[in-house]
């Protein structure tokens, strides 16, 4: 099957596909800002240049397109019928890169959240975004909760000792 578009038309279409400021990313950013979460965009020093970085929460958010990042089981993640081998390899490499970068971030102590494009469709958008806010608050509280220390039980009595030599002498 041949492509319906000329090479120049296809090039123009593909060059219009953005990697930053996509509609799903803007939806998440607008929601976070309205809930007073403050963030940075595409931090250059972190692996994978996460879409959204919340330093206060030690959390990064990736807003992934279902097609480009190979969302398993999603109806929007369908391979094109032409040049399928190329697209399979490309999407597989993207998935491997995503896993590698998230592991690197986790090793650095960052929490990683992935939001898929299909989770921001109007039917479930509010539920997804509220779940995101809940998760961020949960992370914040867990990281900053009071850490209980363990009391080591030893057999030495230090205060109010019951077996003191001077007490034994006075009792005689």
What is the predicted role of each segment?
Residues 1-114, 118-172:
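Nucleic-acid endo/exonuclease domains
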